[in-house]
Amino acid sequence: MSMTLQGSLLDLTETMELRSVAEGLTRTPLAHGAWVDLRPAWLAGAGRLFDALVDVVPWRAERRQMYDSVVDVPRLTRYYAADETLPHPTLRTAREALSDHYQAELGERFATAGLCLYRDGRDSVAWHGDRFGRSRDADTMVAILSVGSPRALHLRPRDGGRTALRLPLGHGDLV
């Protein structure tokens, strides 16, 4: 990739290491039996993973229909189907660790992966309901490993309402 990006000034760890999913994990209950888990600093050395992914992932710029016009998606993306090899061994190890941790509770393993590259403060994601990778009728399993600059993840109920949850995601955090 031809642009210069910086993941973090704070994560100077030389080696990448996934820590225990359960240790330091906090669960926040949501409506209708849903919940969100936050595990700060799950990946040590997230900056090294960020640098590697920026260089090796074949990022895609997409356009989407939004109401009456077609607009640029304000981030770069790459989706990996269940039969595709993930672009870095740490991502494969992370997917296995997440599957091992959550399979008994959720009834299935993580199979696909979607990567997003937010290039600057203008890149973003709008309110949406994750449906990619959904293998069951009612629920969607989504795990997010943040390896770039810190940013907030905002969640709100699908059926509307004013209650929203703001999760500050730091370098190496898992949600």
Task: Name every feature range the model reports, one short phrase each.
Residues 1-175:
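Non-heme Fe(II) oxygenase metal-center motifs and adjacent flexible, charged/small-residue loops
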